[in-house]
Amino acid sequence: MITDQITNTIYFSHMLEQVCPDLYRSMITLKEKGFPIEFFQGAKDMWARDYMPIQVAPNKFVAFKYLPDYLQTPKYRDTITENAADIARDLLGDKAEVIDTDIIVDGGNVIKSDNDASMVDKVIQANPHYSASKLFAELTHLFGCEVFLIPWDDEEGVYGHSDGVVRYLSDGDLLFTKYPDSKYIKQCQYILKYHFNKMHNLWMPSSGAKCRERFQWAYINYIRTKDYIFIPALSKNADCIEDTTALRQFELRFPEYPKENIIPIYALEALKKEGGLHCCS
């Protein structure tokens, strides 16, 4: 499995400019400074993580069917990107194979580890044309590794994405978000503790601003490559107590990255639309 820490390029949809112009300008500035950021054309929204194919090997991507239930309304149906596999093939050329499947998966619901993938079990509900056992077997085949399922907290959100809950660190360790329902996180950890080494939790100070409290989950939605980590920031200068607390924890959890390569990016524009940096990329 290709994990975040061995990737070398970050892609964003050109739609980021239209939907989140401030965040787009931040990314353009980083690109102009030489950071490994690229933009692609042809998508209908900015949430590239959910519709673009998932890299499972150095020269292989899997293009799942993008048909989320939360976009099945007249208002949002036209925002569904159905040609993501073709976009990826244009970007990759003959460098990699893109495999199509009829399994419905949002890419934000796939957290890759060295030898497995973690998903919210909403994926079963999303694929009524598969039995649970057949779906599980096919996902295992496509990813080339074990697949672990954590429960869907449908009271917290309609998306059911694992990248808002947990991320893989390294050496079998996981990092969990500051989640509104601590019982839910404990339930997820109980399931995953048999397959991973250590469980770490992001924490937030009780003295933070009430207006920022609902966005504290977002720090888990960071972007990671082999050289850089980009953390969502809630304040423009990344100087609010939540941002500084999160940054210190990232520096602790990722000692292999120079501190100057762990970079906060003001992302409130995207967070207000219910997605973070990982969701956009």
What is each model feature region?
Residues M1-S281:
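The feature marks the mature, well-folded catalytic cores of soluble enzymes
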